[in-house]
């Protein structure tokens, strides 16, 4: 099937993805460093509309002002030449040894102050480049030993830092939205705000909760053995899906960062169906479809760009399959038989309270639970139809 990306698809990639040199805990890099300017041009060629980056992805840590200015100027020139945008930026608070116990929640107060300053500088650059979202991944915010971290105090410090970032953005007129990226573990033994639910609960405790949402990642949620599509549906319900990271993962193990759809394909299908078709047949999410993956260590740069194209192609193919699934009359019949739409009908009648419900004998005293319990919902048939559409068998 021929599919072609357009800017309206809003596909974006992290500079750290295609630029990953494939160095891991057990082996050295298998690829040379990628020039950010080349990354911009290559991503534009394959149909991306945006590129994102950590501060240290673009400007190496410790660079002097002259070097920094030169790199940023070259990057901006490439953006102008290609039309690529920077929809989101983020900050590296996890690589340098100073962050070995975290950034915002380090036990060392001086590290916490340094971390906030580092993020403020990245916010300045992000605003200069037109970014609308700042992602916050607390990869080192956590502990290996319960006795080593006062979690209550750590959450206080987390809140203190995020409140300051929001105030800075508003005072400077940046208008940024902030998206917390959850992850259960790795690199820390246990990371604070490990799942989408934890992060959504946390942002309600901030001074400006309307400015904060989440950036869930496929692999991160599935590392906790959670259903990613259900998590995204709840984030949408809370109106807290500010950004999304797409990749592939085979269940609860280390963070694999595979190409999107190269892990749990059926869940990827249901996710795209949710994002594109929503609960009412209209797109449920209008933000970037951001790929946060790692091109396999086995690949050279030809393979890197093939993997980048694979992410786009997988998403577009799943989008087409989901569209066909929703348009199939047999699927519509199966959905009706399964009473999927009936869940939108309020359980109580208009104006009804517990007194009226208690007075309704048909709801309990005269209710034939055995007869209703004997009826099937037809969920297996519905799922089979979904799989057949996914496989292109219908």
UniProtKB/Swiss-Prot annotation:
* Alphabetized GO MF terms: magnesium ion binding; xylose isomerase activity
- Could you say which residues bind Mg(2+) 2 here? 217, 220, 255, 257
> In the record's cofactor note, how is the cofactor described as bound?
Binds 2 magnesium ions per subunit.
Q: Which GO terms describe its cellular component?
A: cytoplasm
- Cofactor (UniProt): Mg(2+)
Record's catalysed reaction(s): alpha-D-xylose = alpha-D-xylulofuranose
Location(s), subcellular: Cytoplasm
The entry sums up its family as follows:
Belongs to the xylose isomerase family.
**Listed name of the protein:** Xylose isomerase
From the broadest rank down, the organism's phylogenetic lineage runs: Bacteria, Bacillati, Actinomycetota, Actinomycetes, Micromonosporales
Q: Which gene encodes it?
A: xylA
